[in-house]
Amino acid sequence: MKAGFAQIDFTPLEGFMPGEGLPFWARGEARCPLLASAAAFAGEESVILVSVDALSLFTDRADDLRARISEKTGVPVSHILLAATHTHTGASGYEENSGAPGEPLVAKYTDDCIVNAAVQAFENMKDGFSLGTGKGIEDRMSFNRDCVLDDGRIVSIPGKAAKDHIVGYLGTVDHDVHVMRVDGADSAPACFIVNYANHPDNDNTKRTHFSSDYPGYLRENLQMIYGKDVVVLFLNGACGDVNAFNYKSGVSERYASSNTYMPEEMGKLLTETVCKINREITATDNAPAVKAATRTDTYQLRVPAAWEVEKALATKAQLDAGERIVNSTRRVMESTLSYDPTAPATMEMEMVGMRLGDWTILTVPGELYTEIGLAMKAVAPEKKILVSEQTNGRVGYIPPDKTLGTTAYGGRYYAGMLGLGTKDKMVGAAKALMEELG
């Protein structure tokens, strides 16, 4: 088959890191560099995938990047995937994001590197590659983080002190790990594409340097094992309600202990799993399928719950009385009170389906809850369906109806754009794309 690969390091020397509601500043050598890793494939159609070590790419930014790549390569916009790994220790974008100021110069440099990586991968395409896929399970370090407490409250990320009060979880976890290996004419690995669902928000108190979190350490480990020139793309799965902390256990897992660097340890565990899967993969050159399709559907926008409005009005009263309010609380208040019931109640959102060998990748431009991701994969259980979140845009958290309006973090008004009926719409879109791609 015909394929090409490229990677470009875009780590700034210093700058803000969005992701935790505060303006954390990075300076000095990165713990693990930020890369744009790209793969291009040609068969009956041509496609380009770029994995970007970033928290997210706002939709207008992703649209512009895809258009630039399309203009330079001739690959249709609909056949280009830009997947943010969702690291919480990446660089800022053009505008304020999660408490971190925008840095336009950093963002422009990042964008140029993303485009250049995609174009280089396209220009590097040549014949002689073979492809194989495998699947396994990694269930040692991912847990649902929307906890139901014994007093009936739903609390996201409750902390270990809540261990004796957790009676259940609002959602579940997808432990699947999908691995694609592309071999060169010399039968040596040229590229890995890995799909796994977990939040890359694991720097804790070490949030002083840029880091690509566990996906970056996975990449470094695979390059140490299989060769420094191997390009590794990471596509994050549906992990909007998942992270690496088992709050019910009340103890720190080995990879999260105080004397370890958590992203590095998580990278080691995922590397073990990927290598185990890889040993069972056989790459072939039997002209694998390469094609893509896109569809845009209309979704209901989110509406604030009564308790959210009440809380926002109370915060405003405190502010008007001269009390000091932390910035994160102020942002929530401003977002909630900005709701306009006379404004349009719907929005358009794109989903791309990409066939690559025996994989079908379905893209979602936000932080997808596991329940919806699993439902999308279930539309054709006999096929290898992957969900790639934070891809080609950002609409915030995407939870099922049962989570909306609750105190779960992703269900609150300020946390996302999509409202009631989203799960059914997305499952319908996934089914239609699967039928179109065959």
Question: Which ranges hold each PLM region?
Answer:
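Conserved beta-alpha junction segments in alpha/beta enzyme cores
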Residues: 1-265, 278, 285-438
